[in-house]
């Protein structure tokens, strides 16, 4: 399940790294966090062998959770957007199939290429670009993160990208990649601002993002669905950037960045007087609180991967979205 490229990442800002003090020299920073000397040194986030093992362990845990419809079985191997999407999916599955997943097919991730950035401090992260036995010919891009040496690598992002669309990354002579800071100004949109700009674009349009399936086409589809006989659908989009949802970016060979980021979306369906909201499927019902009478509000978490050039429009290459909750009224 391996082959390599190089990696980078930021995340879980609220935690100070807790490292065993056995013969290790420690010092206190102004913030009160304990810092291990050498932590500020620029180092590869992981070895290629560690990255391959992290991918293997994630796949094993994911398959166990999917087979049993039990979110606790892969909770230690997911975080951020992927954890929000995956745990909700498993919760709905368990509600409808308490004996487990009758359609379980083990996920197989092969032809893995690892892009591992060199960076200082925590969190550290890397990208696995893989082929899967699901999702057609799309490449599965997973971003793994961790906040300390004793912590488990967790998958924070999972996006699917069409073959040939994954860019070449800038690497040093040893094959290690370069992490792009969240506040970088040498790209069209600083990675920290992509989630806000994307959600603003979905509401108002604009020229920041290139036309495509996840931009102009999605806006057109939502506009088409907003008003139908007896039913009005409203859309609200919000950025999601803090903690485990922080964006992560890799420098591309042409000077731009490949950015992974998260957003939150709400869809409210309201039925006209004397009519009712169409009955949703069982998975939606399993995640919905309250009785659906005149309206249904659904909350989704979406993780995106975008090509953020040094100059020009941002291209959203892939997006995976999942329902996380619902409310009937």
Swiss-Prot record:
Lipidation (S-diacylglycerol cysteine): 33
GO cellular component: plasma membrane
Assigned keywords, A-Z: Cell membrane, Lipoprotein, Membrane, Palmitate, Signal
Source organism, top-level taxon: Bacteria
Signal sequence, renumbered to the chain: 1-32
Primary location recorded for the protein, binned into one broad class: membrane
Keyword Membrane: yes
Annotated localization: Cell membrane
Lipid-modified sites (N-palmitoyl cysteine): 33
Recorded topology in the membrane: Lipid-anchor
Name of this chain's protein: Uncharacterized lipoprotein SCO2278
Annotated organism of origin: Streptomyces coelicolor (strain ATCC BAA-471 / A3(2) / M145)
